[in-house]
Amino acid sequence: MEFLVQKIGMSRTIDANSTPVTLLKVLQAKVCQLENGKALVAYAMHKKHNKAIEGQQKKYQLSKEFNHFATLKASQQKELGDLDLSALETLKRVKASFKTKGRGFAGVMKRWNFQGGPAAHGSRFHRRPGSIGNREWPGRVQKGRKMAGHYGNELVTCQNEVLSFDKESMVLVLKGSVAGFSGAYGRIRAV
């Protein structure tokens, strides 16, 4: 069973052993279609609206706030309507999938923790990658070479222990951290 969530942020438990926790808001979703253990769900996110979304809302008789669609694994869901959240109350562990913070085009020191060169005394080799090849053989740069490039914005999945779930406020409390910035959208699924 999968659920759509939004990361609220991090906090800690107030007891003898202070435990770092992540707070996730479980999004209200409507099941529009069920097929082979998968569910097409609609959920509210921002105010994006166009004719294609309008057509989908008309097709599935949705109100205007449900303007995004996603496919989730929903083996226990038997009927259309609100997504069944009863499974969240008994969960012990979940896999949380989020995109990491995007850092744009980054150099080798930031992206791969390269040491860099001397900072002074006539050196012109400060933050550069250095040599990237071998000799006449292989005569090319080998695959997997650590270089400057796009850093972050990758899907990362980690397992977390569930500490509690508040059904009224729809807040799930996980032990430890998950990837992404506060406000990021992601998915959780039962382990």
Curated annotation (Swiss-Prot):
InterPro entries in UniProt: Ribosomal_uL3, Ribosomal_uL3_bac/org-type, Transl_B-barrel_sf
Segments of this protein annotated with the region Disordered: 119-138
Disulfide bonds: none
Alphabetical GO biological process terms: translation
GO terms assigned for molecular function: rRNA binding; structural constituent of ribosome
Any GO CC annotation of this UniProt entry: cytosolic large ribosomal subunit
Keywords: Ribonucleoprotein, Ribosomal protein, RNA-binding, rRNA-binding
UniProt function note: One of the primary rRNA binding proteins, it binds directly near the 3'-end of the 23S rRNA, where it nucleates assembly of the 50S subunit.
The family this protein is said to belong to: Belongs to the universal ribosomal protein uL3 family.
Subunit description: Part of the 50S ribosomal subunit. Forms a cluster with proteins L14 and L19.
Protein name per Swiss-Prot or TrEMBL: Large ribosomal subunit protein uL3
